[in-house]
């Protein structure tokens, strides 16, 4: 008897215990009870088995985000029939959908409410294309058998398919009365997109939690605020990007959200400044951030926000190792591994590349443990910036940027540099829509010279995927090539003379008043030469630090003019 060790077994147990309890609900008031969910699952499983679905065969699930009830039925129906579900996002371009179905080896697709690319192979059906009066079918799933294939976020490269067994998905879930999660709430709310690991976690939570799951088709700050107020939501699940949007929208202050006692964030690191603002806006709520990955789940760390260590992501089964896999001393940065007693996940293609080892999963992040065992992240392995022999963590730079009062959101990436190899560059979302004039001076007191971004651009919003994570590979495209945009000609006498010096030092034909010395290829050696020539030309002491603090031609010229005016 599989019982609680398979996903459909959990559903069967919950339907037997509380058949009329609401499992899922929509903001429009529609509901799906556990009894209805179980019966529709039986009907679909019987139809799939009758049509010849074999144990272990894979079935793609493609649903409009308003069709959570149908998705829940399809997911459990495929699993009860012994199949493997492949949840996909309807937001994906048709070509990517076809690629993922092909890579996963799906024999067919269950879809509802969205178009299916004509190139998609295999059979197609809807979740309701089954006999609603079908008898209960035996659960053909086993704890050790595969249950789902979910794709990683693909923010830095190609998304990879990850296989999870029933034992992995059900680990830690208990639908027994008195042991159900979130018993302090009548509803828990989320707006995680279908096809993501976060959405799958919410589906499993809905099977075993005490409250009903209030599912939002898409995240909209005003709609979430209204739903929380109307349904008196007790638990709110977000990704950090959603939390920022809620804070910026004013919804947390304009509505009665006093029912919220728990805010859980996942999918990315919750910045301390955002956690602090949430705690102030929702004084009755505990703010909790969960750190994990698609590959590592259900292994995780959990951190209740603590103003004494705002950037920690919690404690748990965590190891920090060097490149050879040896554990490093406390406080030293290395590769982050998190462990769990659950059956591990694996990549579908078997190319584990050192990710999975003896119950431990390498997350792809770098981090350190402090003296009390709290984990502090230092960025992605693949995002580390190597500039002139110095290693720069984008995560560290982003933390400093977020401390600026005008910066709402930010991301840091590496741009190629002909001398230093790479340089950090920042993409900002600011309250004014422009790069703060004092940004470099502000960062100079918080970061080393190598860590200060040498190019900065402002955008309306960062490029993010369905799960709210920044698409790192898209950041570089936001920076125009050096010299590709014309800038205004120097205006003042000082600007014109300084532009001539820049042209000599940098070996460029022309310099505009809006140009940036570092963006045009300036480095520490050329900055030294620039400082000497400026001192000779204008007869003012010129420390290199003054030039680094203001790399624009116009701002350097203004600084020089002020020094000249102050001269006796």
Can you say where each PLM-predicted feature lies in the sequence?
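Conserved AMP-binding A3 loop
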Residues: 31-35, 147-174
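Conserved AMP-binding/adenylation subdomain of ANL enzymes
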Residues: 170-187, 195-235, 249
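Conserved structural elements of the adenylate-forming
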Residues: 38-46, 143, 162-183, 191, ...
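Conserved C-terminal "lid"/linker of ANL adenylate-forming enzymes
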Residues: 385, 411-417, 425-427, 439-488, ...
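Conserved AMP-binding/adenylate-forming core of the ANL superfamily
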Residues: 3, 20-52, 60-69, 76, ...
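Conserved ATP/PPi-binding loop(s) of AMP-dependent carboxylate-activating enzymes
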Residues: 312-315, 326-358, 374, 390-392, ...
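AMP-binding/adenylate-forming catalytic core of the ANL superfamily
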Residues: 236, 340, 345-346, 366-451, ...
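Gly/Ser/Thr-rich phosphate-binding loop
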Residues: 235-237, 251-309, 327
């Amino acid at each position: 008897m599989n019982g609680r060790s398979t996903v459909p077994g959990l559903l069967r147990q919950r339907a037997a215990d509380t058949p009329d309890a609401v499992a899922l609900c929509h903001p429009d008031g529609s509901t799906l009870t556990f009894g209805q969910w179980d019966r529709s699952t039986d009907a679909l499983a019987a139809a799939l088995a009758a049509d010849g679905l074999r144990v272990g065969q894979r079935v793609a699930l493609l649903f409009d985000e308003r069709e959570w009830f149908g998705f829940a039925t399809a997911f459990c129906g495929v699993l009860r029939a012994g199949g493997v579900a492949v949840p996909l996002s309807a937001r994906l371009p048709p070509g990517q959908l076809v690629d993922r179905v092909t890579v996963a080896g799906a024999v067919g697709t269950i879809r509802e409410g969205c178009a299916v690319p004509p190139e998609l192979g295999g059979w197609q059906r809807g979740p309701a294309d089954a006999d609603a009066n079908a008898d209960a079918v035996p659960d053909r799933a086993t704890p050790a058998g595969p249950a789902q294939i979910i794709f990683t976020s693909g923010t830095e490269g190609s998304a990879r398919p990850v296989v999870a067994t029933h034992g992995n998905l059900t680990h830690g879930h208990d639908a027994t009365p008195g042991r159900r999660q979130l018993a302090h709430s009548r509803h828990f709310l989320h707006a995680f997109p279908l096809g993501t690991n976060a959405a799958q976690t919410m589906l499993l939570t809905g099977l075993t939690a005490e409250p009903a799951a209030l599912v939002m088709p898409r995240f909209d700050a005003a709609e979430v605020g209204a739903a929380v107020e109307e349904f008196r939501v007790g638990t709110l699940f977000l990704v950090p990007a959603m939390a920022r949007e809620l804070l910026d929208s004013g919804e947390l202050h304009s509505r009665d959200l006093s029912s919220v006692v728990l805010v859980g964030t996942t999918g990315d690191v919750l910045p301390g400044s955002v956690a602090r603002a949430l705690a102030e806006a929702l004084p009755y709520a505990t703010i909790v951030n969960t750190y994990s990955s698609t590959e590592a789940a259900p292994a995780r760390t959990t951190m209740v926000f603590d103003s004494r260590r705002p950037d920690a992501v919690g404690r748990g089964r965590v190891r920090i190792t060097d490149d050879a896999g040896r554990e490093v001393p406390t406080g030293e940065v290395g590769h982050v591994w998190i462990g769990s007693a659950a059956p591990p996940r694996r990549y579908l293609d078997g190319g584990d590349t050192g990710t999975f080892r003896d119950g431990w999963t390498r997350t792809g992040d770098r981090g350190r443990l402090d003296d009390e065992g709290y984990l502090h992240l230092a960025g992605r392995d693949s995002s580390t910036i190597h500039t002139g022999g110095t290693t720069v963590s984008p995560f560290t730079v982003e933390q400093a940027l977020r401390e600026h009062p005008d910066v709402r959101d930010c991301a840091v990436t590496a741009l190629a540099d002909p001398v230093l190899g790479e340089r950090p560059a920042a993409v900002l979302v600011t309250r004014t829509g422009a790069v703060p004039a004092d940004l470099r001076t502000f960062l100079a007191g918080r970061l080393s010279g190598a860590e200060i971004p040498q190019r900065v651009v402002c955008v309306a919003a960062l490029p993010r995927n369905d799960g709210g994570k920044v698409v790192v590979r898209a950041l570089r495209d936001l920076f125009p090539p050096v010299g590709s945009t014309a800038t205004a000609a120097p205006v003042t006498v000082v600007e014109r003379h300084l532009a001539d010096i820049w042209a000599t030092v940098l070996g460029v034909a022309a310099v505009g008043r809006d140009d940036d010395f570092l963006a045009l290829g300036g480095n520490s050696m050329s900055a030294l030469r620039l400082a000497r020539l400026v001192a000779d030309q204008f007869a003012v002491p010129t420390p290199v630090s003054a030039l680094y603090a203001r790399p624009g031609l116009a701002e350097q010229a203004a600084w020089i003019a002020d020094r000249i005016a102050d001269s006796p």
